[in-house]
């Protein structure tokens, strides 16, 4: 990638002026957030933040486009995998509707009156159930959530059979009124967007011991079904990698190898108390980062030189390409060892000794800008982690309302003849 080949890019920007240790701490906090399951919405906020930092650092836009191009193939590969592994779009039940069901614990679905959505990952999971013993009139329908005891249910043939059973319970309600009330309450379901998947109906289960009816929605899927969930999952994972690439680009493009070595050494300073050679470790990392651009540039030169001699790296079978690759690997290894030897000789000539204490020519001071940046990022980090632990973020991928299609219409449910 171009940013690695060019390495450090001097600019007069806010990001360049930050203390090296400050940039490393912010980088580590963002990496932690990327690997924490914070949900698609919060991760998108982090992505926008990293993009904002990238451009206020005054880095060339081609670096940004290069990073996106480099993960396009990964996105397509993940989309292909998710196409066949996540063919189930699932159903949604909104928190507003959950709040109308008195027996549900709404604490995990709402936080500070934020409207959230509960994603039913498996369409063969129960959405809600109701007790027929409380069905004395249309105003006393007692709906509530029932968790993981579907094995005890006995199949009922369909919605009409369910309405007939309730009407024969001696409650004085006709089948049509019960069916009408049932349909009204079951318009709480949303079907996630998909191509080739259609709502097919409910399997209605009855437990004679507890007098509970469980409603399980199911779908009719075409062979080519592609769900929006599969697309989001592919983008979700790709976005994680893109965030790390972009911020690594910002870190290496706004900090020289000397600054990175200084920042790493200061960040790992407590390890000196247990006799770990932090300065050697920091110097090793700084040298490795410094030589990545050089080696990539050398590899490009070798590829061009070999191509000018008629060597084809793109065409041919697998074995042919592997033999051609040796023409790149062997010179690269030779160049790497040669550079390492020259660097070691140069450092010895300048009197470098890893066991000796070294002074620093450049003095980096913590300013109020560093303190403010650390405070804001750390506060943001704590809030996101807190909301994640509380379960107050959008569940699973954090699917917002615009990903939902309309309610399953009444006529579709009314016309169903579902067999158990």
Curated annotation (Swiss-Prot):
InterPro entries: ABC/ECF_trnsptr_transmembrane. It comes from Mycoplasma genitalium (strain ATCC 33530 / DSM 19775 / NCTC 10195 / G37) (Mycoplasmoides genitalium). Signal peptide: none annotated. Keywords: Cell membrane, Membrane, Transmembrane, Transmembrane helix. It is a multi-pass membrane protein. It comes from the Bacteria. The chain crosses the membrane at residues 26-46, 66-86, 231-251, 276-296, 317-337, 369-389. Its main location: membrane. One of its GO terms (cellular component) is plasma membrane. Pfam families: CbiQ. This is Uncharacterized protein MG181. Belongs to the CbiQ family. It is found in: Cell membrane. The keyword Transmembrane helix applies.
